[in-house]
Amino acid sequence: MPTGVPILEYHMVDEVDPEEGWTYNVPPEDFRQQLDYLQQQGYTTITPLEFMKAKKGKLDLPEKPIILSFDDGYENNYTTMLPILEAHNMKAVVYMATNSIGRPNYLTWDELREMQDRGVEIGSHTANHQPLTHLDHEKQLEEIKLSKLLMEWNGIRTVFSFSYPNGEVSPEMPEMLKENEYLTAVTGDAGLNTFDTNPYLLQRTNIPHPRFGLMEFKLRLLKAAVMTKLGIHQH
């Protein structure tokens, strides 16, 4: 397989003022430039499920695969991000906190189902977006199980992927996710992923509001590769 698969961690793609505190927002024009750059560099987007299919020998990965991920499930993922994504013929995964569905500024059930029909993988970001490390075992199980069940009951095809709220992971979490039929989970640790990476501890590169334009984006991609090469990971 390639030397490693980067996973980019986005949240919002919208026209908002970063001075208002939206540090996790990438303006649409910056997002377009980032996707243009990825295409120029020969990257092809895949989903977490496709990564796992390739790991099991059921799918061949492209020469330079990359995963675009979006946490929380903001409505601008549908109204703003998706058209830009489709214009670049790219894929993504959206990790949804289910108790936010239908609330102001968040995705609705109809939007989630349509996004899945248009090639976006839908994953779980728990029910209440509470860091799982702050909960007891029973509450952790509830957050993991209920979010998956609720989405599948509401017409989302099988949910296989998970994102840890705040990127916080406890030692027992990978096994809990496996027992509840998840196939992958993403953390907040920077780095690249190979078939040897624990699929429940996949590493991501955070993409916040770009204060320094496209150069910052390029440096963040480079940082993930360097950290992997040096073996600087938490997991």
List PLM regions with ranges:
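Short, glycine/acidic-enriched loop or turn micro-motifs at the edges of active sites
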Residues: 74-75, 128
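Short histidine/acidic/glycine/proline-rich micro-motifs that form metal-
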Residues: 98-102, 131, 165-168
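Short beta-strand and adjacent tight-turn residues that come in two discontinuous sequence segments
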Residues: 95, 125, 187
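Alpha-helical scaffolding within the catalytic cores
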Residues: 51-54, 77-82, 101-118, 146, ...
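Acidic (Asp/Glu)-rich catalytic clusters
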Residues: 82-90, 107-124, 178, 196
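Histidine-centered catalytic micro-motifs
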Residues: 8-12, 121-129
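C-terminal active-site subregion of NodB/CE4 polysaccharide deacetylases
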Residues: 1-69, 75-78, 134-235
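Active-site flanking residues adjacent to catalytic metal/cofactor-binding acidic residues
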Residues: 70-71, 124
